Amino acid sequence: MLNKKIIKPAGKVATEFENTVAQALVDLENNNAELKDLKDLSVCSVKEVDVAESKKAVVIFVPFRQLKNYNKIQQKLTYEVEKKLGGKQVMFIAQRRIIRKPASNNKIKMQKRPISRTIKAVHDAILDDLVFPNTIVGRRLRYRLDGSKLHKIYLDRKEMLSNISKVDSFSAVYHKLTGKEVVFEFTQQTAEN
């Protein structure tokens, strides 16, 4: 049953931690009536990211075509998987591939690169998957005096109470996956007349 839950490329073997997460998903699929939709869903890989000295986050990569199905049950599924993994924060991200920019000196004609496979599109999609079900309402790119960049991401204030504890995890996971430094903030409440 675990072999069907984890999809790996030929020749790759699932790690012990990936098997643990897959077993947790199988248990939830069998025991929880609300999560019966998990039967058709699978996992590509699982990574564990250090957030702070004692905090860890778990990133579960799912096939791109199954992301919408995961999103339908994601809030309940995240809560249940976090309980099974001992309180580690869980995030679901679609497995995407970046195709590099074709070199100008390449004599062989290459296939055109789709916009969805560019590095910017993939990094933006990872960001959207990371903060789901919250929505990103604004982005700012700040250039520091030393030349480094800081991305400021503004999240919707409606989901602030449920996501305020996850903001550190969001930035640590995004930095680990993309190498970009990110700060998440919630929008300011404006006075309505």
Curated annotation (Swiss-Prot):
GO terms for biological process: ribosomal small subunit biogenesis; rRNA processing; translation. GO terms for cellular component: cytosolic small ribosomal subunit; small-subunit processome. GO terms for molecular function: structural constituent of ribosome. InterPro entries: Ribosomal_eS7 (IPR000554). Keywords: Ribonucleoprotein, Ribosomal protein. Disulfide bonds: none annotated. The keyword Cytoplasm does not apply. The keyword Ribosomal protein applies. Belongs to the eukaryotic ribosomal protein eS7 family. This is Small ribosomal subunit protein eS7. It comes from Dictyostelium discoideum (Social amoeba). The gene is rps7.
